[in-house]
Amino acid sequence: MVVIRLSRGGSKRRPFYNIVAANSANRRDGRFLERVGFYNPVASGGEEALRIAFDRVEHWVSHGAQLSPTAARLVKQAQAKVAPAA
């Protein structure tokens, strides 16, 4: 089963997460099918904290992918941020 979830990167005490579509049998930071965005929880200043390719998320969901609870929360948060601008 394909899952859209967070894969941790960054360094100690400075996390950075890639939002990836991966097989659920693979490890959290292991092999993935496609990177669909990123989340930087410690973004400061002009750094971008969250970017998601909604078209790719929709593609994977239409092909049966499940969103992890955290990924679903971030997608919802990003859509709320984009909607008022549009």
From Swiss-Prot:
Keyword tags: Ribonucleoprotein, Ribosomal protein
Gene Ontology BP terms: translation
Record-level Gene Ontology MF annotations: structural constituent of ribosome
GO cellular component, one term: small ribosomal subunit
InterPro entries: Ribosomal_bS16, Ribosomal_bS16_dom_sf
Pfam family, one: Ribosomal_S16
HAMAP family per the UniProt record, alphabetical: Ribosomal_bS16 (MF_00385)
NCBIfam families, alphabetized: S16
Family the UniProt entry places it in: Belongs to the bacterial ribosomal protein bS16 family.
Name of this protein: Small ribosomal subunit protein bS16
Organism expressing this protein natively: Leptothrix cholodnii (strain ATCC 51168 / LMG 8142 / SP-6)
Protein encoded by which gene: rpsP
